[in-house]
C-alpha cells in the first residue's frame, strides 16, 4: 500500500541518514510523499526529553515544505483507520494518544482522513508552491490552516521551478 511506501521514504529516510552519520539541520519535503519524516523527527526529539508540543516546534523550525499539486485530488490522503494501524505504537513512543498524532493531518477534528499536505504544512516553518500562480492557488487551497488571515497573508510563498542550463547540460550536449 502507498502508506507503507511513504513510511519507508519518510521514517526510513531519516533513519538511513542517521545510520551513515548525516544530521541535517533542515529537511525539505517535496509534497507529502516523505512527510512521515516529520513524525520520525518528533519521535527523536521526544526521545531526547522534549514534550510532544516542544518536539513539534523543534521539527517545524528545521522544516520546509513544497507543495506541487494545486488540486485536492492529487494530494495523498489516508483513512484514519489505516494510519492508526501503523502509528498507534508510534504515538505511544511519543507519550501521546493516536488522536494527538492524527490531528497533524486532519482538515477538521471530525475528519476520518489524514492529509499529507496538511501535515507537511503544519510541520514546516516555511512553505512554497512551484510558481507564482501556484503559490496563489495554494494560499487559497490551504487558507483554513490560518484562520483569520487574509488570503494574501497566508504564509505560502513560491519558488519558480527551473534549471540553470550552463550547470545542468553536459558539455557534449551544450556543444550541439
Residues covered by each model-derived region:
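Catalytic cores of carbohydrate-active enzymes across secretory and cytosolic contexts
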Residues: 1-176
Amino acid at each position: 500500500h502507498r502508506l507503507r511506501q511513504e513510511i519507508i521514504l519518510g521514517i526510513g529516510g531519516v533513519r538511513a541518514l542517521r545510520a551513515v552519520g548525516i544530521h541535517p539541520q533542515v529537511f525539505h519535503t517535496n509534497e507529502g510523499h516523505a512527510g512521515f519524516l516529520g513524525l520520525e523527527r518528533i519521535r527523536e526529539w521526544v526521545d531526547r526529553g522534549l514534550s510532544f508540543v516542544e518536539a513539534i516546534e523543534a521539527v517545524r523550525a528545521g522544516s520546509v515544505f513544497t507543495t506541487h499539486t494545486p488540486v485536492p485530488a492529487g494530494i495523498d490522503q489516508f483513512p484514519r483507520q489505516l494510519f492508526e494501524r501503523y502509528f498507534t505504537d508510534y504515538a505511544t513512543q511519543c507519550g501521546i494518544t493516536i488522536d494527538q498524532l492524527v490531528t497533524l493531518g486532519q482538515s477538521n477534528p471530525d475528519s476520518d482522513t489524514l492529509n499529507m499536505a496538511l501535515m507537511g504544512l503544519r510541520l514546516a516553518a516555511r512553505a512554497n508552491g512551484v510558481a507564482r500562480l501556484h503559490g496563489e492557488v495554494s494560499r487559497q487551497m490551504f487558507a483554513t490552516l490560518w484562520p483569520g488571515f487574509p488570503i494574501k497573508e497566508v504564509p505560502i510563498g513560491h519558488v519558480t521551478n527551473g534549471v540553470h542550463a550552463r550547470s545542468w547540460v553536459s558539455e557534449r550536449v551544450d556543444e550541439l
